[in-house]
Amino acid sequence: APHGDFRRAVEQERALGQLDDVVAYYEAYLQGDEPGGPASSRLKQEFDHVRDTLGDLPGRILDQKRLRTMLAHLGKTLHVGFLNDCFFDPASALCLRSDDRPAAPVISRCSPDRCPNSCLTSRHVAPWRASIEDGERLLQGNTLSAVQKVAIAQDNDRKRRLIAHLEDPKV
């Protein structure tokens, strides 16, 4: 069963990577780089609980093993993406249809601005900005109908709202 051993090793590495990403989320949160998107309030509650439980204060040496143990449940559901990350919960995932097997998010049907599992960080801003700029370039041309221009303008407004908090935390 050499293939089974390899698959297990790959799965273990994936799980460790997911946990590393969640720890990075937590550390960024402690530095004031708060996540955005619909899942952010749930994450902030989790992170506040971890901080309060561990007494994670500036200048204090943190027990990394205990931190990773407390965040492990988030790592199991994390799916890292280009435009957003998903802390996948099949019960609330907007990307799933009734006939889907809820093993993972369906990225092509993701609604980052509406799904309660969606979370964005500062690393997601650049692709959203690029998409907004592409839309603005299209709006400058004269090849689109009035309806298409309205749709692109509305979509750009939606994208701006989605990343506003990440670009200016006071928003």
Whereabouts are the PLM-identified features?
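Acidic, low-complexity interaction regions
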Residues: A1-V171
